[in-house]
Structures are given as structure tokens and as C-alpha cells.
Amino acid sequence: MKILNLFLVSLLLSSCGSGSNKQNPQELNYYDIKGFFEREIKELEKANPTVNKTTVYNQEEEIRTLKIEKWEQELALFSESDINKSSWKGSYKIDSLPNQLIYSAKEEDLRTRKIVIDFKDNKPSKFSIQNKNSNYLYTSIEDLTFYPDSLYIIHKKQKVVLLGGNDYKIVGKLKD
């Protein structure tokens, strides 16, 4: 019985090792959007800025000034637009311009359709992301824009067969 307990404890400890599920940055196929937003979320949580947040749902507008409690939730759509899955290697066309990087989906079934990253002084200054989900019952289009340390915009249009459409937009302006 002692041997079995020791075996189970050692098995448990070995499975909790220092290994990580994150991909090594040298193995990434595309820009590390998920890593960028993870770092940005930590910085925003630390800074705890006040946000002027405008929410528009089907043309009904609400404006509030608040502190965001869960930045991970607030910016989830940006993080979820990561295209660095090993199965997607080669699935995006890469265009590189001075101070701009553009990824365009080559396959129609990919959710993230296009990513444009603008750079200033070799640092990202703007992210523009277009996502689309579609099937025979549902279509969802997301246009996401993020300016580090100043502004984020989430614009989502949904259309559900027999139920109609919804349009919502969130604009968050960070204040010092």
C-alpha cells in the first residue's frame, strides 16, 4: 500500500512539472498575438486605468466611466484571435510592409480572417482584426481594433436565421 501511495504521489508530482502548454516563441508561425495581449492585460490590471466605455446595442447607447475588473474578459476576443496553432501553419498569407504586418486567411473556414498590425519604433501601435463565424443558422462578424494604452473597439454583428440580427459596439477609451 505504501508503494502504491508513493507511486501515486510521484506520478502526481511529475505531472505538475515545470512544463508549459505555451508554444516556444521560436516555434511560432505568426506574430504572438496571444502573448502580446496576455502581457497587455497584466499591465492594465497593474495600472488599473479608468475607462470611458461606450456600449451600443442595436442603436441604444450607454456611456459609463468605470474601472474594468476583469481585463482578461474585456479583451478576450483579441486573445482568442491567436492564429499560432500548429495545424494552421501555412494557412495565412503574410504581407509585410514598412511598419505593418498583414495576415490574411487562405481558407474560408478559418475564424480569424485578417489581422493588420501597425508598428511604431518596432512596437505594435495598432491591431485590426476581422473574425467571422458562419453556418447555415448563424453568422457572426467581429471587427476588433486595439491601440495599446489608449483605446479598444469591439464591433460585432450577428444574424440568426428566424431570429434576426444584432449589432453591438464597445468603445473603451483609457484615461490616465
What are these regions (language model features)?
Residues S14-S15:
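C-terminal motif of bacterial Sec signal peptides marking the signal peptidase cleavage site
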Residues I102-D176:
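Extracytoplasmic electrostatic interaction patches
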Residues P25-A47:
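Post-signal peptide N-terminal segment of mature Sec-exported envelope proteins
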Residues I41-I117:
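Surface-exposed acidic loop/strand-edge motifs in secreted or periplasmic proteins
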Residues S18:
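Short, conserved catalytic or interaction motifs in soluble domains
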Residues K2-V9:
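Sec-dependent signal peptide recognition
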